[in-house]
From Swiss-Prot:
Gene: Cp18
Main location, first listed in the record: secreted
Residue span of region Disordered: 154-174
Pfam families referenced in this protein's UniProt entry, alphabetically: Chorion_2
Biological source species: Drosophila subobscura
Protein name: Chorion protein S18
Alphabetical UniProt keywords: Secreted, Signal
Function: Chorion membrane (egg shell) protein; plays a role in protecting the egg from the environment.
Record keyword Signal present: yes
GO cellular component: egg chorion; extracellular region
Compartments, record wording: Secreted
Composition-biased stretches (Low complexity): 154-165
Protein family membership: Belongs to the chorion protein S15/S18 family.
């Protein structure tokens, strides 16, 4: 899926950056390919910045956008004669969205590592046992956990109940 997305973005960048079909209306004054190029991982190495005049930009003779090192786009450094300083007439500087994106990227890289993934630990579930008739209309009788007979006491209780059922009801003579 990632490979497909990269191929699609590159195709959009190539189509909108080419001069085929003359000057087309696009997003603002920049062709969409200029923004699609910045989505690529090469953002850390190069940026597309406006170039005015000359025959080197994506817009050919009418200016347009050109790939240049990030340092020349976001700093005042002069990167040789090829790119020149940012404040010159050749480059118009980076759009404010790009400055914000770079600032957020630097902030994210400076943040401490989050560590391992968060593990959700559920509390143990308590199952309520229901005894009595299983008819849909009849209410079920529920016993508290302390009232349930367990182990030997369950056997004793059942034998005493079975004995009482055969002999009938008797008063205890205390």
């Amino acid at each position: 899926m990632m490979k497909f997305m990269c191929i699609f973005i590159c195709a959009v960048a190539a189509v909108s950056a080419s001069g085929y079909g003359g000057r087309r209306p696009s997003y603002g004054s920049a062709p969409i390919g200029a923004y699609a190029y910045q989505v690529q991982p090469a953002l850390t190495v190069k940026a597309i910045i406006p170039s005015y005049g000359g025959q080197r930009g994506y817009g050919h003779n009418q200016g347009g956008y050109e790939a240049a090192p990030i340092a020349s786009a976001y700093g005042n450094a002069d990167i040789g004669n090829q790119y020149g300083p940012v404040s010159g007439s050749r480059y118009g500087g980076a759009p404010p969205v790009d400055r914000e994106a770079i600032a957020l990227a630097k902030l994210a890289l400076a943040a401490p590592s989050a560590g391992g993934p968060l593990v959700w630990r559920e509390a143990p579930r308590r199952v309520q046992h229901a005894y009595g008739p299983s008819n849909y209309g009849a209410p079920q009788q529920r016993y508290a956990r302390a009232e349930e007979a367990q182990g030997a006491s369950a056997a004793a209780a059942s034998s005493s109940v079975a004995g009482v059922a055969k002999k009938g009801y008797r008063k205890s003579s205390y």
